[in-house]
Amino acid sequence: MKVILFGTGNYYRQSKAYIDMTQVICFVDNDPKKTGAMLDGKKIMTPKEADFTNCDYVLVLVMRYQSILEQLSALGVSRDKIKLYPDLDDLFEVKPCICSEGKQYDFTQWAANRPEKKVMLICHELTRNGVSVVLMHVAQVLKRMGYCPLMSALLEGELLEELQENHIDYIPQIHLFYGGRQFADFIGKMEFIIVGTIGIADVVWRIAHIEVPVVWWIHESNDKDFHDFPLLVRNNVYYYAGGKRVVECFKKHYPYLSVEKMLYYLPDNRVETKCRDAIFRIGIIGLIYPRKAQDIFVEAVKKIPAEKKNAISFEIVGKYIEPVIDMDKVLKENPEIQYIGEMSQRALNDYFAGLDLLVCPSRDDPMPVVVTQAMQYGIPCIVSDQVGQSEYIIDGKNGFVFPTENIKALKEKIIYCIDHKDILSDIGQESRKIYENYFSVEAMEENLLRIEDRVRR
């Protein structure tokens, strides 16, 4: 077998351990700066220089491969000659493993030692993003119900430690083999599969033919995602939406498909609430990038009169992803604002125990976990009308809602809370009822029982 590898970046570096370089003719890359260089003993060529008639397959090791497919088609390469990175297992010997209780097992060993009914949960990465954490919590509920859950993701990350602590088995990186025969055979042993985001649509398209029930739990509520990641119509694919806003966006694009609303479960892991000191703490928590609207929060804080900011700490918590605010400038010009950075879940629980008010001004946020966590702690929340929990909030009774990107309205809500600290405890207790009614373990068990009934029909 002779193979040309298209791509020399991150996906090649992750794949190279499995690739037999004696079968590789050359690399192809669109970056002119790499042309002519040698990589692992093979020359890097431009697409026009490579002789694709001299190979059996072209293996595309690029994440967004659609433009590469079009490019290869224009060069006369037939589609059946092209393999994508999830097909690596079809060309080379890939030995995926499952991590369980500190040990590694191949698919056959793991399945043989698990007599329980098995459910696989798939997300895009095993990091502390909302969807991955939510799926981990579902895995915990499935264990309570007698299932053997198995977490998997395209990429691994910092969630691995928590999976180990919770005794949840996982496959750390399926992006190199989810299109291959081994994975297809293994999927067939599952009772059903839960896929946690629209962004890994390609995985669903690859596994749906196996006829195992696929529960596609979509959490996105913007038109671009529904345009970029097409859904499919199959009898074994069941659609669920993580809130009212997701349902509305789903039906806008797919009015002919059935979809049911299913909210996530959040474990009640509250730590003891700290004694309040003289400082009134207002926090915004989440990845720092435009969708989370930290810029709106900062601008609202800047417009609050100075005399209202006495003994107030405005705190930004989260990992900096994209420039939405100039953090150094913000901190220098606004001493009442603090940047705390990213927190583990354990640290975040401790943080919530001392927080007085949460602000979530997101431009688009179907059902942010941090808002539910605040409600769990009985912390009053100010959210934009583009935040999913807003559908359960009665303004001024169990929280506060303002029009998205309306800096003046957010400023007024914050000032109201500063001026009426004496009623915030009651509002927080009312917000706790939202958590109990919609996000508890009992609610999730009922959801999973309904899924069981639906997929067995």
Describe the predicted segments one by one:
Residues 152-157, 285, 313-325, 341:
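Glycosyltransferase donor-sugar binding loop
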Residues 409, 416, 423-438, 450:
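A short, well-ordered alpha-helix in the C-terminal region of glycosyltransferases
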Residues 326-343:
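Nucleotide-activated donor-binding/catalytic signature segment of Leloir-type glycosyltransferases, i.e.
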Residues 395-396, 400-407, 416-421:
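Conserved acidic donor-binding segment of nucleotide-sugar-dependent glycosyltransferases
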Residues 129-137, 289-303:
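A conserved mid-protein helix/loop that constitutes part of the nucleotide-sugar donor-binding site
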Residues 342-343, 350-355:
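Short alpha-helical donor nucleotide-sugar binding micro-motif in glycosyltransferases
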Residues 152, 380-383:
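Short hydrophobic beta-strand element within catalytic cores of glycosyltransferases
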Residues 363:
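Aromatic "clamp/platform" in nucleotide-sugar-dependent glycosyltransferases that forms part
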